Design a protein with these regions (language model features):
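FIC/Doc superfamily catalytic core
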Residues: 1-348
């Protein structure tokens, strides 16, 4: 059986790029904490936007989709699901809300993991929600010619409860070691969870929920305000390649965690960088939405479209962005380049 041992994180032989990533994340985390205390309303608005994006993206990765309008209604208005996909989405909404509101009281324990899985699967009516798999599963891949082959064989169903018990204990043991950086430990645990593949269905979505849970519990909550799952979805080819590399040799305890660690930390770093962009204003001033739009354009080295500004500042309405840009063009602080959908704005 697979042995779960994270002591290598304490031997000082870590790649320099991972050490640098953790340092950069820590610095951005400190800045975000200061801003959160000062700009509570902005963070509340960002959280509402990110929640919709997270629920949409985490399900989309698994091919579970519906319209943006329906996603918003399910998330913000508790609209009843109209079909199977929407039932899956509603279940993820409930599990994510549970983590957002109660992460301090939830832990990486089998009981909590099973409860979150049951919650996630409940709307879709699956009988196996909250239960470990009873049949063995395999991870398939399809080559360019359409041929299927087994890419990975997860832990057999008969060994899954024991493997999950050992994973839980190994994590709790490593977590209590003050010399182990939690940012490096979390990706290792998530990788092992994915390789066990403990459930018949929903393992990928559960891995993202558990990633957020462990990050939040350790104070790294950028994923609340900039969708962690959307970043994964945007760069999912890199995610799956890192997962492939780190799972190679897993069954025989010969795998390297480093590719997956780098991918998860890079995703978290992008969340913090995006969050930082949304506060790109002159220090000392009250951050109004108008000031944030102005600063976003004035601090950019390249021309920006209205759509790009709206993506950077998702809590600011397109109408507000358009009004501010129009005023800036009139005052001469920026100039308009192009026309129609190709219109961009750049500092004069």
């Amino acid at each position: 059986m697979r042995k779960f041992d994270y002591s290598f994180l304490n031997n000082g032989l870590l790649p320099a790029n991972l050490v640098n990533l953790t340092s950069n994340i820590a610095a951005l985390k400190t800045m975000a904490g200061v801003r959160k205390n000062e700009y509570t309303q902005i963070f509340t608005e960002l959280e509402a936007v990110a929640k919709v994006q997270s629920i949409k993206s985490s399900n989309a990765i698994e091919g579970i989709v519906t319209s943006d309008e329906r996603i918003a209604a399910i998330v913000n208005q508790n609209s009843a699901p109209l079909n199977h996909n929407e039932a899956e989405i509603a279940g993820y909404r409930d599990a994510l809300n549970e983590i957002h509101l109660g992460y301090e009281h939830i832990d990486f324990r089998q009981s909590d993991i099973l409860r979150l899985h049951e919650m996630m699967m409940s709307f879709a009516g699956y009988e196996y929600g909250g239960q470990y798999k009873t049949d063995d599963n395999v991870i398939l891949e399809i080559d360019a010619d359409g041929n299927r082959r087994v890419r990975f064989r997860p832990t057999p169903a008969s060994e899954t409860p024991k493997a999950m018990e050992q994973l839980e204990l190994a994590y709790l043991d490593a977590r209590s070691n003050a010399n182990i950086n939690q940012l490096l430990l979390i990706p290792c645990v998530i990788l092992d969870f994915l390789c066990i593949h403990p459930f018949r269905d929903g393992n990928g979505r559960m891995s993202r929920l558990l990633s957020l849970l462990l990050l939040y519990k350790n104070g790294f909550d950028a994923g609340k305000y900039v969708s962690f799952e959307e970043q994964i979805n945007n760069y999912k080819a890199y995610y799956y390649e890192a997962l492939r590399q780190s799972s190679a040799g897993w069954e025989t305890n010969e795998n390297s965690y480093f590719p997956f660690i780098e991918n998860l930390l890079s995703t978290l770093y992008m969340c913090y960088k995006e969050l930082d962009k949304r506060f790109a204003v002159v220090h000392g001033k009250k951050i109004t939405k108008k000031a944030r739009v102005e600063a976003t354009v004035l601090n950019s080295l390249t021309p920006l479209s209205k759509a790009e500004i709206c993506k950077i500042l998702p809590d600011v309405s397109p109408t507000t962005v358009e009004a501010v840009l129009g005023a800036m063009v009139k005052t001469g602080s920026v100039k308009r380049i192009g026309a129609g959908r190709a219109t961009r704005y750049i500092k004069v």
